[in-house]
Amino acid sequence: MNPVSLLSLSGERRSANWKPSSWDSNQIHQSLKSDFNDLQEKWHTELKQAVEQMLEAVAEPLQKLTLIDDIQRLGVAYRFEKQIDDALSSIYSNYAAEVSSKKDLLAASLYFRLLRQHGCYVSPDIFIQFKDEAGQFKASLGDDVEGLLSLYEASYLGIKGETILDDAKAFSTSTLENLMPHVEADIASRISHALHLPLHWNMRRMEARLYIDVYRENKKRRNDNLLEFARLDFNMLQVIHQRDLKDVSFWWDFLDLPRKLGFIRDRLMESFIFSVGLNFEPQFSECRKAATKDILLITVLDDIYDIYGSMDEVEIFNNAVNRWDLGAVDELPEYMQLCYLGLLNSVNELAYVTMKDTGRNVLDFLKKLWKRHFNAAVKESRWFHRQYTPTLEEYMENAQISIGAPLVLTHAYVKMLKYMPNEDVNHVDKYLKLISMMCYVFRLYDDWGTSKAEIERGDVPKAIQCYMHEAKVSEEIAREHIKNIINERWKELNEECLKATDLNRKFVAAVLDALRAAAFFYHDRDGFGEPDHKFKSQAMALFSQQV
Protein backbone atom coordinates (compact mmCIF):
# COMPACT_ATOMS: atom_id res chain seq x y z
CA MET A 1 0.00 0.00 0.00
CA ASN A 2 1.27 3.46 -0.84
CA PRO A 3 1.92 5.37 2.41
CA VAL A 4 0.03 8.38 1.07
CA SER A 5 -3.18 6.35 1.04
CA LEU A 6 -3.04 6.02 4.80
CA LEU A 7 -2.35 9.67 5.51
CA SER A 8 -4.91 12.38 5.88
CA LEU A 9 -3.76 15.15 3.62
CA SER A 10 -6.32 17.77 4.56
CA GLY A 11 -4.71 20.85 6.02
CA GLU A 12 -1.06 21.64 6.53
CA ARG A 13 0.97 18.99 8.34
CA ARG A 14 4.04 19.54 10.43
CA SER A 15 6.97 17.22 9.82
CA ALA A 16 9.98 16.38 11.95
CA ASN A 17 11.92 15.17 8.90
CA TRP A 18 13.27 12.24 10.88
CA LYS A 19 16.26 10.47 9.42
CA PRO A 20 15.42 6.95 8.27
CA SER A 21 16.62 4.10 10.43
CA SER A 22 20.21 3.07 9.76
CA TRP A 23 19.08 -0.53 10.30
CA ASP A 24 16.77 -2.62 8.16
CA SER A 25 15.44 -6.05 9.01
CA ASN A 26 17.74 -7.83 6.56
CA GLN A 27 20.77 -6.11 8.04
CA ILE A 28 19.63 -6.99 11.56
CA HIS A 29 19.09 -10.65 10.72
CA GLN A 30 22.35 -10.91 8.76
CA SER A 31 24.46 -9.29 11.48
CA LEU A 32 23.01 -11.28 14.39
CA LYS A 33 24.68 -14.65 13.97
CA SER A 34 26.59 -15.20 17.20
CA ASP A 35 26.82 -18.75 18.49
CA PHE A 36 27.40 -20.39 21.87
CA ASN A 37 28.09 -24.12 21.75
CA ASP A 38 27.94 -26.89 24.34
CA LEU A 39 31.69 -26.84 24.93
CA GLN A 40 31.61 -23.12 25.67
CA GLU A 41 28.66 -23.63 28.01
CA LYS A 42 30.57 -26.33 29.91
CA TRP A 43 33.61 -24.07 30.20
CA HIS A 44 31.34 -21.22 31.36
CA THR A 45 29.96 -23.45 34.15
CA GLU A 46 33.43 -24.51 35.29
CA LEU A 47 34.69 -20.93 35.34
CA LYS A 48 31.66 -19.82 37.33
CA GLN A 49 32.61 -22.33 40.00
CA ALA A 50 36.19 -21.03 39.94
CA VAL A 51 35.01 -17.45 40.49
CA GLU A 52 32.75 -18.60 43.34
CA GLN A 53 35.74 -20.28 44.98
CA MET A 54 37.79 -17.14 44.49
CA LEU A 55 35.12 -15.06 46.23
CA GLU A 56 35.20 -17.47 49.15
CA ALA A 57 39.00 -17.63 49.29
CA VAL A 58 39.81 -13.90 49.32
CA ALA A 59 39.88 -12.83 52.96
CA GLU A 60 41.48 -9.38 53.00
CA PRO A 61 38.61 -6.82 52.88
CA LEU A 62 40.10 -4.43 50.29
CA GLN A 63 41.00 -7.32 47.99
CA LYS A 64 37.47 -8.68 48.32
CA LEU A 65 35.94 -5.26 47.62
CA THR A 66 38.17 -4.91 44.57
CA LEU A 67 37.13 -8.34 43.32
CA ILE A 68 33.43 -7.54 43.83
CA ASP A 69 33.89 -4.23 42.01
CA ASP A 70 35.45 -6.05 39.06
CA ILE A 71 32.68 -8.65 39.01
CA GLN A 72 30.05 -5.91 38.98
CA ARG A 73 31.73 -3.80 36.34
CA LEU A 74 32.30 -6.82 34.11
CA GLY A 75 28.54 -7.36 34.12
CA VAL A 76 28.46 -10.77 35.82
CA ALA A 77 27.40 -9.89 39.38
CA TYR A 78 23.93 -11.32 38.73
CA ARG A 79 25.59 -14.76 38.61
CA PHE A 80 26.92 -14.40 42.19
CA GLU A 81 24.22 -12.51 44.06
CA LYS A 82 24.22 -14.59 47.25
CA GLN A 83 28.01 -14.70 47.53
CA ILE A 84 28.25 -10.93 47.02
CA ASP A 85 25.43 -10.29 49.50
CA ASP A 86 27.16 -12.39 52.14
CA ALA A 87 30.55 -10.80 51.50
CA LEU A 88 29.30 -7.22 51.64
CA SER A 89 27.19 -7.89 54.73
CA SER A 90 30.25 -9.29 56.49
CA ILE A 91 32.44 -6.38 55.41
CA TYR A 92 29.78 -3.89 56.51
CA SER A 93 29.65 -5.44 59.96
CA ASN A 94 33.38 -5.88 60.53
CA TYR A 95 35.42 -3.48 58.38
CA ALA A 96 34.13 0.03 59.18
CA ALA A 97 36.67 0.83 61.91
CA GLU A 98 39.57 -0.52 59.88
CA VAL A 99 38.74 1.42 56.71
CA SER A 100 38.27 4.62 58.74
CA SER A 101 41.74 4.34 60.26
CA LYS A 102 43.77 3.33 57.20
CA LYS A 103 43.74 6.72 55.45
CA ASP A 104 43.54 4.84 52.16
CA LEU A 105 41.44 6.88 49.70
CA LEU A 106 40.87 3.96 47.33
CA ALA A 107 39.76 1.63 50.13
CA ALA A 108 37.47 4.19 51.77
CA SER A 109 35.86 5.21 48.48
CA LEU A 110 35.35 1.65 47.30
CA TYR A 111 33.90 0.63 50.66
CA PHE A 112 31.51 3.59 50.63
CA ARG A 113 30.32 3.09 47.03
CA LEU A 114 29.83 -0.66 47.08
CA LEU A 115 28.03 -0.69 50.43
CA ARG A 116 25.70 2.16 49.44
CA GLN A 117 24.96 0.44 46.14
CA HIS A 118 24.10 -2.61 48.22
CA GLY A 119 21.57 -0.63 50.26
CA CYS A 120 23.70 -0.14 53.38
CA TYR A 121 24.02 3.31 54.91
CA VAL A 122 27.66 4.32 55.27
CA SER A 123 28.38 7.71 56.82
CA PRO A 124 30.14 10.18 54.51
CA ASP A 125 32.25 11.17 57.51
CA ILE A 126 34.55 8.39 56.34
CA PHE A 127 36.06 11.04 54.03
CA ILE A 128 36.83 13.61 56.74
CA GLN A 129 40.25 11.98 57.21
CA PHE A 130 41.20 13.17 53.71
CA LYS A 131 40.63 16.86 54.47
CA ASP A 132 43.17 19.33 55.81
CA GLU A 133 42.81 21.74 58.72
CA ALA A 134 41.14 24.29 56.45
CA GLY A 135 38.42 21.78 55.57
CA GLN A 136 39.64 21.23 52.01
CA PHE A 137 40.53 17.91 50.43
CA LYS A 138 44.30 17.51 50.66
CA ALA A 139 46.20 18.53 47.55
CA SER A 140 48.46 15.49 47.98
CA LEU A 141 45.53 13.27 46.96
CA GLY A 142 46.26 14.39 43.41
CA ASP A 143 49.11 11.87 43.39
CA ASP A 144 46.66 8.98 43.81
CA VAL A 145 44.85 8.67 40.47
CA GLU A 146 43.13 5.38 41.34
CA GLY A 147 41.97 6.80 44.65
CA LEU A 148 40.67 9.95 42.96
CA LEU A 149 38.72 7.94 40.38
CA SER A 150 37.23 5.88 43.19
CA LEU A 151 36.35 9.03 45.17
CA TYR A 152 34.73 10.56 42.09
CA GLU A 153 32.56 7.47 41.54
CA ALA A 154 31.65 7.29 45.24
CA SER A 155 30.51 10.91 45.31
CA TYR A 156 27.57 10.07 43.02
CA LEU A 157 26.05 7.85 45.72
CA GLY A 158 25.40 10.89 47.93
CA ILE A 159 22.07 11.99 49.35
CA LYS A 160 20.78 15.48 50.13
CA GLY A 161 22.61 17.33 52.87
CA GLU A 162 25.90 15.45 52.50
CA THR A 163 28.05 18.46 51.65
CA ILE A 164 31.27 16.54 52.06
CA LEU A 165 30.27 14.43 49.04
CA ASP A 166 29.49 17.58 47.05
CA ASP A 167 33.00 18.75 47.95
CA ALA A 168 34.41 15.34 46.99
CA LYS A 169 32.69 15.49 43.61
CA ALA A 170 33.95 18.99 42.85
CA PHE A 171 37.49 18.22 44.06
CA SER A 172 37.85 14.89 42.26
CA THR A 173 36.35 16.26 39.03
CA SER A 174 38.63 19.29 38.81
CA THR A 175 41.72 17.33 39.88
CA LEU A 176 41.10 14.55 37.37
CA GLU A 177 40.52 17.10 34.60
CA ASN A 178 43.87 18.70 35.42
CA LEU A 179 45.63 15.33 35.53
CA MET A 180 44.41 14.10 32.14
CA PRO A 181 47.15 15.71 30.00
CA HIS A 182 49.88 14.33 32.29
CA VAL A 183 49.01 10.65 32.65
CA GLU A 184 49.41 7.66 30.36
CA ALA A 185 46.94 7.28 27.51
CA ASP A 186 45.04 4.33 29.01
CA ILE A 187 44.54 6.15 32.32
CA ALA A 188 43.52 9.34 30.51
CA SER A 189 40.94 7.32 28.57
CA ARG A 190 39.50 5.91 31.81
CA ILE A 191 39.33 9.40 33.32
CA SER A 192 37.62 10.79 30.23
CA HIS A 193 35.07 7.98 30.26
CA ALA A 194 34.30 8.49 33.95
CA LEU A 195 33.97 12.26 33.62
CA HIS A 196 31.64 11.87 30.65
CA LEU A 197 29.20 9.73 32.64
CA PRO A 198 29.85 8.34 36.14
CA LEU A 199 29.49 4.64 36.78
CA HIS A 200 26.35 5.07 38.91
CA TRP A 201 24.62 6.90 36.04
CA ASN A 202 25.81 4.73 33.16
CA MET A 203 24.01 1.91 31.39
CA ARG A 204 25.37 -1.28 32.91
CA ARG A 205 25.56 -3.31 29.71
CA MET A 206 27.55 -0.62 27.92
CA GLU A 207 29.84 -0.32 30.93
CA ALA A 208 30.39 -4.08 30.98
CA ARG A 209 31.39 -4.20 27.32
CA LEU A 210 33.91 -1.41 27.82
CA TYR A 211 35.27 -2.74 31.11
CA ILE A 212 36.04 -6.17 29.63
CA ASP A 213 38.61 -4.43 27.41
CA VAL A 214 39.92 -2.24 30.25
CA TYR A 215 40.24 -5.24 32.57
CA ARG A 216 42.03 -7.29 29.90
CA GLU A 217 44.76 -4.64 29.64
CA ASN A 218 45.20 -4.26 33.42
CA LYS A 219 47.78 -7.00 34.00
CA LYS A 220 48.34 -6.04 37.66
CA ARG A 221 44.66 -6.41 38.55
CA ARG A 222 43.46 -8.97 36.02
CA ASN A 223 42.40 -12.47 36.99
CA ASP A 224 42.36 -14.63 33.89
CA ASN A 225 39.57 -16.92 35.09
CA LEU A 226 37.31 -13.97 35.85
CA LEU A 227 38.15 -12.30 32.54
CA GLU A 228 37.39 -15.47 30.57
CA PHE A 229 34.16 -16.02 32.48
CA ALA A 230 33.05 -12.44 31.77
CA ARG A 231 33.92 -12.86 28.09
CA LEU A 232 31.95 -16.09 27.78
CA ASP A 233 29.02 -14.71 29.74
CA PHE A 234 28.86 -11.63 27.53
CA ASN A 235 28.81 -13.81 24.42
CA MET A 236 26.19 -16.13 25.92
CA LEU A 237 23.92 -13.19 26.70
CA GLN A 238 24.56 -11.73 23.27
CA VAL A 239 23.07 -14.85 21.66
CA ILE A 240 19.96 -14.50 23.84
CA HIS A 241 19.67 -10.78 23.08
CA GLN A 242 20.03 -11.48 19.37
CA ARG A 243 17.16 -13.94 19.52
CA ASP A 244 15.02 -11.38 21.37
CA LEU A 245 15.84 -8.69 18.82
CA LYS A 246 15.01 -10.95 15.90
CA ASP A 247 11.63 -11.81 17.45
CA VAL A 248 10.74 -8.14 17.90
CA SER A 249 12.05 -7.34 14.43
CA PHE A 250 9.60 -9.85 12.88
CA TRP A 251 6.75 -8.24 14.83
CA TRP A 252 7.79 -4.73 13.72
CA ASP A 253 8.10 -5.86 10.11
CA PHE A 254 4.63 -7.40 10.30
CA LEU A 255 3.09 -4.11 11.52
CA ASP A 256 4.98 -2.26 8.77
CA LEU A 257 4.21 1.11 10.37
CA PRO A 258 7.34 2.96 9.15
CA ARG A 259 6.34 2.30 5.53
CA LYS A 260 2.63 2.93 6.02
CA LEU A 261 3.15 6.06 8.13
CA GLY A 262 6.06 7.83 6.54
CA PHE A 263 6.26 10.60 9.17
CA ILE A 264 7.21 8.45 12.20
CA ARG A 265 10.56 7.56 13.74
CA ASP A 266 11.63 4.03 12.89
CA ARG A 267 13.70 3.19 15.96
CA LEU A 268 13.70 -0.57 16.49
CA MET A 269 17.36 -0.89 17.50
CA GLU A 270 17.22 2.13 19.78
CA SER A 271 14.11 0.78 21.49
CA PHE A 272 15.71 -2.61 21.97
CA ILE A 273 18.88 -1.12 23.44
CA PHE A 274 16.72 0.71 25.96
CA SER A 275 15.00 -2.57 26.89
CA VAL A 276 18.37 -4.28 27.37
CA GLY A 277 19.43 -1.37 29.56
CA LEU A 278 16.28 -1.92 31.59
CA ASN A 279 16.70 -5.70 31.98
CA PHE A 280 19.68 -7.54 30.48
CA GLU A 281 19.59 -10.81 32.44
CA PRO A 282 18.83 -13.99 30.46
CA GLN A 283 15.52 -14.87 32.13
CA PHE A 284 13.92 -11.55 31.18
CA SER A 285 13.56 -12.11 27.42
CA GLU A 286 9.80 -11.58 27.50
CA CYS A 287 10.26 -8.39 29.50
CA ARG A 288 12.74 -7.05 26.93
CA LYS A 289 10.47 -7.87 24.02
CA ALA A 290 7.42 -6.31 25.68
CA ALA A 291 9.40 -3.17 26.60
CA THR A 292 10.67 -2.83 23.03
CA LYS A 293 7.14 -3.06 21.64
CA ASP A 294 5.93 -0.52 24.21
CA ILE A 295 8.65 1.96 23.28
CA LEU A 296 8.02 1.56 19.55
CA LEU A 297 4.27 2.15 19.97
CA ILE A 298 4.82 5.08 22.34
CA THR A 299 7.23 6.62 19.82
CA VAL A 300 4.76 6.28 16.94
CA LEU A 301 1.92 7.78 18.95
CA ASP A 302 4.20 10.50 20.30
CA ASP A 303 4.97 11.55 16.73
CA ILE A 304 1.24 11.72 16.01
CA TYR A 305 0.41 13.73 19.12
CA ASP A 306 3.43 16.03 18.99
CA ILE A 307 3.93 16.56 15.27
CA TYR A 308 1.64 15.12 12.64
CA GLY A 309 -1.86 14.96 14.10
CA SER A 310 -4.23 17.91 14.10
CA MET A 311 -5.73 18.88 17.43
CA ASP A 312 -9.12 17.49 16.38
CA GLU A 313 -7.57 14.17 15.40
CA VAL A 314 -5.62 13.91 18.63
CA GLU A 315 -8.78 14.57 20.66
CA ILE A 316 -10.67 11.89 18.71
CA PHE A 317 -7.87 9.38 19.26
CA ASN A 318 -7.70 10.24 22.95
CA ASN A 319 -11.43 9.69 23.32
CA ALA A 320 -11.07 6.31 21.63
CA VAL A 321 -8.31 5.30 24.06
CA ASN A 322 -10.43 6.34 27.04
CA ARG A 323 -13.32 4.24 25.69
CA TRP A 324 -10.98 1.30 24.94
CA ASP A 325 -13.49 -0.07 22.50
CA LEU A 326 -12.67 -1.87 19.27
CA GLY A 327 -15.71 -0.23 17.69
CA ALA A 328 -14.10 3.20 18.13
CA VAL A 329 -11.67 2.42 15.32
CA ASP A 330 -14.25 3.42 12.69
CA GLU A 331 -14.38 6.95 14.10
CA LEU A 332 -10.65 7.53 13.62
CA PRO A 333 -8.82 9.00 10.63
CA GLU A 334 -7.55 6.19 8.44
CA TYR A 335 -3.89 6.70 9.35
CA MET A 336 -4.72 6.38 13.07
CA GLN A 337 -6.71 3.17 12.78
CA LEU A 338 -3.70 0.88 12.46
CA CYS A 339 -2.04 2.55 15.46
CA TYR A 340 -5.16 2.14 17.57
CA LEU A 341 -5.58 -1.52 16.66
CA GLY A 342 -1.88 -2.14 17.28
CA LEU A 343 -2.18 -0.57 20.73
CA LEU A 344 -5.23 -2.60 21.74
CA ASN A 345 -3.77 -5.83 20.39
CA SER A 346 -0.43 -5.29 22.15
CA VAL A 347 -2.04 -4.56 25.53
CA ASN A 348 -4.51 -7.43 25.22
CA GLU A 349 -1.69 -9.81 24.29
CA LEU A 350 0.34 -8.74 27.35
CA ALA A 351 -2.70 -9.27 29.59
CA TYR A 352 -3.36 -12.68 28.05
CA VAL A 353 0.23 -13.91 28.45
CA THR A 354 0.36 -12.62 32.03
CA MET A 355 -2.88 -14.43 32.86
CA LYS A 356 -1.51 -17.62 31.31
CA ASP A 357 1.86 -17.40 33.10
CA THR A 358 0.80 -16.12 36.52
CA GLY A 359 -2.97 -16.46 36.80
CA ARG A 360 -3.24 -12.69 37.37
CA ASN A 361 -5.70 -10.53 35.40
CA VAL A 362 -3.91 -7.26 34.68
CA LEU A 363 -6.01 -5.94 31.77
CA ASP A 364 -7.85 -3.21 33.70
CA PHE A 365 -4.57 -2.19 35.32
CA LEU A 366 -2.85 -1.87 31.92
CA LYS A 367 -5.74 0.05 30.35
CA LYS A 368 -5.65 2.53 33.22
CA LEU A 369 -1.93 3.13 32.62
CA TRP A 370 -2.36 3.80 28.89
CA LYS A 371 -5.30 6.14 29.46
CA ARG A 372 -3.24 8.09 31.99
CA HIS A 373 -0.39 8.36 29.49
CA PHE A 374 -2.55 9.63 26.64
CA ASN A 375 -4.43 12.09 28.84
CA ALA A 376 -1.06 13.62 29.71
CA ALA A 377 0.00 13.63 26.06
CA VAL A 378 -3.18 15.38 24.91
CA LYS A 379 -2.68 18.09 27.52
CA GLU A 380 0.68 18.92 25.92
CA SER A 381 -0.95 19.01 22.48
CA ARG A 382 -3.49 21.50 23.80
CA TRP A 383 -0.71 23.63 25.23
CA PHE A 384 1.03 23.71 21.86
CA HIS A 385 -2.08 24.58 19.85
CA ARG A 386 -3.01 27.31 22.34
CA GLN A 387 0.59 28.59 22.33
CA TYR A 388 0.64 28.25 26.10
CA THR A 389 3.92 28.02 28.02
CA PRO A 390 3.44 26.41 31.45
CA THR A 391 5.62 27.01 34.47
CA LEU A 392 8.36 24.46 35.01
CA GLU A 393 6.42 22.91 37.90
CA GLU A 394 3.21 22.65 35.86
CA TYR A 395 5.07 21.22 32.89
CA MET A 396 6.94 18.61 34.94
CA GLU A 397 3.84 17.46 36.79
CA ASN A 398 2.41 16.40 33.43
CA ALA A 399 5.59 15.62 31.50
CA GLN A 400 6.85 12.97 33.90
CA ILE A 401 3.75 10.98 32.88
CA SER A 402 3.73 11.77 29.14
CA ILE A 403 7.35 10.66 28.80
CA GLY A 404 6.14 7.04 28.65
CA ALA A 405 8.63 5.69 31.19
CA PRO A 406 5.89 4.94 33.77
CA LEU A 407 4.20 2.74 31.16
CA VAL A 408 7.35 0.87 30.25
CA LEU A 409 8.31 0.30 33.88
CA THR A 410 4.92 -0.88 35.04
CA HIS A 411 4.71 -3.21 32.05
CA ALA A 412 8.17 -4.46 33.04
CA TYR A 413 6.86 -5.09 36.55
CA VAL A 414 4.01 -7.16 35.12
CA LYS A 415 6.41 -9.18 32.96
CA MET A 416 8.75 -9.77 35.93
CA LEU A 417 5.98 -11.07 38.20
CA LYS A 418 6.66 -14.73 37.50
CA TYR A 419 10.25 -14.21 38.69
CA MET A 420 9.12 -12.33 41.82
CA PRO A 421 6.93 -14.89 43.64
CA ASN A 422 6.09 -12.61 46.58
CA GLU A 423 4.94 -9.77 44.34
CA ASP A 424 1.51 -9.07 42.86
CA VAL A 425 0.13 -6.43 40.51
CA ASN A 426 -1.74 -5.04 43.52
CA HIS A 427 1.63 -4.38 45.16
CA VAL A 428 2.83 -2.00 42.46
CA ASP A 429 1.58 0.98 44.49
CA LYS A 430 4.52 0.63 46.86
CA TYR A 431 6.86 1.35 43.93
CA LEU A 432 5.00 4.40 42.64
CA LYS A 433 7.06 6.94 44.58
CA LEU A 434 10.31 5.49 43.28
CA ILE A 435 8.94 5.27 39.73
CA SER A 436 7.65 8.85 39.88
CA MET A 437 11.00 10.15 41.13
CA MET A 438 12.81 8.29 38.36
CA CYS A 439 10.42 9.52 35.66
CA TYR A 440 10.96 13.13 36.73
CA VAL A 441 14.70 12.83 36.04
CA PHE A 442 14.06 10.76 32.92
CA ARG A 443 12.00 13.61 31.47
CA LEU A 444 14.75 16.11 32.27
CA TYR A 445 17.35 13.92 30.53
CA ASP A 446 15.07 13.61 27.50
CA ASP A 447 14.47 17.36 27.34
CA TRP A 448 18.18 18.04 27.82
CA GLY A 449 19.06 16.04 24.72
CA THR A 450 16.10 16.85 22.48
CA SER A 451 14.52 20.20 23.36
CA LYS A 452 16.40 22.45 20.92
CA ALA A 453 15.55 20.32 17.87
CA GLU A 454 11.97 19.76 19.04
CA ILE A 455 11.31 23.48 19.43
CA GLU A 456 12.77 24.14 15.97
CA ARG A 457 10.41 21.66 14.31
CA GLY A 458 7.39 22.82 16.33
CA ASP A 459 6.62 21.22 19.68
CA VAL A 460 5.39 22.19 23.12
CA PRO A 461 8.03 24.08 25.16
CA LYS A 462 10.20 21.67 27.13
CA ALA A 463 11.64 22.00 30.63
CA ILE A 464 14.44 24.32 29.53
CA GLN A 465 12.12 26.66 27.61
CA CYS A 466 9.55 26.63 30.42
CA TYR A 467 12.17 27.77 32.91
CA MET A 468 13.57 30.35 30.48
CA HIS A 469 10.07 31.80 30.09
CA GLU A 470 9.22 31.63 33.79
CA ALA A 471 12.50 33.01 35.18
CA LYS A 472 13.29 35.32 32.22
CA VAL A 473 16.78 33.83 31.82
CA SER A 474 19.01 32.69 28.96
CA GLU A 475 19.15 29.13 27.69
CA GLU A 476 22.61 28.72 29.23
CA ILE A 477 21.33 29.64 32.69
CA ALA A 478 18.24 27.47 32.23
CA ARG A 479 20.36 24.49 31.27
CA GLU A 480 22.53 24.96 34.35
CA HIS A 481 19.36 25.06 36.46
CA ILE A 482 18.08 21.82 34.90
CA LYS A 483 21.50 20.21 35.40
CA ASN A 484 21.37 21.10 39.10
CA ILE A 485 17.87 19.64 39.39
CA ILE A 486 19.09 16.38 37.83
CA ASN A 487 21.91 16.19 40.37
CA GLU A 488 19.61 16.89 43.32
CA ARG A 489 16.95 14.46 42.14
CA TRP A 490 19.55 11.72 41.82
CA LYS A 491 20.40 12.31 45.47
CA GLU A 492 16.74 11.88 46.38
CA LEU A 493 16.65 8.64 44.39
CA ASN A 494 19.76 7.41 46.17
CA GLU A 495 18.12 8.08 49.51
CA GLU A 496 14.88 6.38 48.49
CA CYS A 497 16.83 3.29 47.43
CA LEU A 498 18.56 3.17 50.81
CA LYS A 499 15.12 3.18 52.45
CA ALA A 500 13.65 0.60 50.08
CA THR A 501 14.28 -2.41 52.29
CA ASP A 502 10.79 -3.85 51.68
CA LEU A 503 10.97 -3.59 47.87
CA ASN A 504 12.07 -6.25 45.42
CA ARG A 505 15.69 -5.52 44.58
CA LYS A 506 15.38 -6.76 41.00
CA PHE A 507 12.65 -4.27 40.22
CA VAL A 508 14.37 -1.43 42.09
CA ALA A 509 17.41 -2.15 39.92
CA ALA A 510 15.19 -2.02 36.81
CA VAL A 511 13.88 1.41 37.84
CA LEU A 512 17.41 2.80 38.19
CA ASP A 513 18.53 1.04 35.02
CA ALA A 514 15.75 2.75 33.06
CA LEU A 515 17.19 6.08 34.16
CA ARG A 516 20.70 4.97 33.25
CA ALA A 517 19.42 4.12 29.77
CA ALA A 518 17.97 7.64 29.54
CA ALA A 519 21.34 9.10 30.54
CA PHE A 520 23.03 6.99 27.86
CA PHE A 521 20.67 8.24 25.14
CA TYR A 522 20.31 11.89 26.14
CA HIS A 523 23.29 12.95 28.24
CA ASP A 524 25.00 14.80 25.41
CA ARG A 525 22.84 14.11 22.33
CA ASP A 526 19.49 12.89 21.10
CA GLY A 527 20.69 9.34 20.76
CA PHE A 528 17.16 8.04 20.24
CA GLY A 529 15.66 10.45 17.72
CA GLU A 530 18.90 11.28 15.89
CA PRO A 531 21.32 8.38 16.50
CA ASP A 532 24.83 8.99 15.19
CA HIS A 533 27.70 6.83 13.96
CA LYS A 534 28.97 6.37 17.51
CA PHE A 535 25.61 4.94 18.51
CA LYS A 536 25.73 2.40 15.69
CA SER A 537 29.20 1.30 16.80
CA GLN A 538 27.94 0.87 20.35
CA ALA A 539 24.98 -1.18 19.16
CA MET A 540 27.23 -3.42 17.07
CA ALA A 541 29.52 -3.95 20.07
CA LEU A 542 26.56 -5.06 22.18
CA PHE A 543 24.67 -7.26 19.75
CA SER A 544 26.84 -8.22 16.80
CA GLN A 545 30.50 -8.42 17.74
CA GLN A 546 31.51 -11.22 20.07
CA VAL A 547 34.22 -10.54 22.63
UniProtKB/Swiss-Prot annotation:
GO terms for biological process: diterpenoid biosynthetic process. Coiled coil: none annotated. Mg(2+) 3 binds at D446, T450, E454. Keywords: Cytoplasm, Lyase, Magnesium, Metal-binding. (2E,6E)-farnesyl diphosphate binds at R265, D302, D306, R443, D446. One of its GO terms (molecular function) is terpene synthase activity. Binds 3 Mg(2+) ions per subunit. The keyword Metal-binding applies. SUPFAM superfamilies: Terpenoid cyclases/Protein prenyltransferases (SSF48239), Terpenoid synthases (SSF48576). Pfam families: Terpene_synth (PF01397), Terpene_synth_C (PF03936). InterPro entries: Isoprenoid_synthase_dom_sf, Terpene_cyclase-like_1_C, Terpene_cyclase_plant_C1, Terpene_synth_N, Terpene_synth_N_sf, Terpene_synthase-like, Terpene_synthase_metal-bd, Terpenoid_cyclase/PrenylTrfase. Mg(2+) 1 binds at D302, D306. Mg(2+) 2 binds at D302, D306. It is found in: Cytoplasm. Its cofactor is Mg(2+). It catalyses: (2E,6E)-farnesyl diphosphate = (1S,5S,6R)-alpha-bergamotene + diphosphate. Pathway: Secondary metabolite biosynthesis; terpenoid biosynthesis. A motif (DDXXD motif) lies at residues 302-306. One of its GO terms (cellular component) is cytoplasm. It is an enzyme of class 4 (lyase). The Asp-Asp-Xaa-Xaa-Asp/Glu (DDXXD/E) motif is important for the catalytic activity, presumably through binding to Mg(2+). Sesquiterpene synthase involved in the biosynthesis of volatile organic compounds. Mediates the conversion of (2E,6E)-farnesyl diphosphate (FPP) into alpha-bergamotene. Does not use (2E)-geranyl diphosphate (GPP) as substrate. Belongs to the terpene synthase family. Tpsb subfamily. Monomer. This is Sesquiterpene synthase TPS3. The lineage of its organism: Eukaryota, Viridiplantae, Streptophyta, Embryophyta, Tracheophyta. The gene is TPS3.
